[in-house]
C-alpha cells in the first residue's frame, strides 16, 4: 500500500467518523427533546389533576371557598408513575388575591389563586406551573 492510499484511507475514516458522530448527536438530541416533551405533558396533567381535584371538592361542597388557602397553602406531594419509573414533586400554593391573581393581605377577599408547580427528574428541563383563580360566587 502506497503512502497516497494510506492518506486516502485515513481521510475516509475521518469522514465516516465525523458523519456518524454528527448523526448520533442529532439522534441523541431528538431523543432528549422527546423525553422532555413526554415529561412536560405528564407534569401538565398532574397540575390539571390537582386543580380539578379542588374544583370537584368545591362542587361537591366538601371544600368551602374560605378554606382553600388554609387547606392548600404551601403543601407538597410526591407522585410516582411506575410506567415512567419517575417521581414528580408537586408544590401547591394558595393565596388570597385580586381578580388578576396578585396577592392581597385581606383573608376575606372574593378571589383565591391556587398555583401548582411540578418538578421532576433531570429530563424535565423546566418546572411546569399552572394557576387558577377561584371566585366566590355565593355572596
Regions found by a protein language model. Give the residues of each.
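Aliphatic-rich helix starts adjacent to a transmembrane/signal segment
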Residues: 1-48
Amino acid at each position: 500500500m502506497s503512502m497516497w492510499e494510506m492518506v486516502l484511507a485515513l481521510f475516509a475514516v475521518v469522514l465516516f467518523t465525523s458523519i456518524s458522530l454528527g448523526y448520533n448527536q442529532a439522534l441523541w438530541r431528538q431523543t432528549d427533546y422527546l423525553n422532555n416533551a413526554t415529561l412536560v405533558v405528564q407534569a401538565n396533567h398532574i397540575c390539571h389533576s390537582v386543580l380539578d381535584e379542588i374544583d370537584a371538592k368545591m362542587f361537591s361542597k366538601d371544600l368551602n371557598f374560605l378554606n382553600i388557602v388554609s387547606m392548600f397553602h404551601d403543601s407538597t406531594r410526591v407522585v410516582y408513575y411506575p410506567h415512567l419509573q419517575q417521581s414528580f414533586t408537586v408544590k401547591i400554593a394558595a393565596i388570597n388575591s385580586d381578580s388578576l391573581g396578585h396577592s392581597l393581605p385581606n383573608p376575606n377577599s372574593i378571589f383565591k389563586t391556587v398555583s401548582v408547580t411540578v418538578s421532576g427528574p433531570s429530563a424535565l428541563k423546566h418546572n411546569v406551573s399552572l394557576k387558577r383563580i377561584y371566585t366566590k360566587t355565593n355572596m
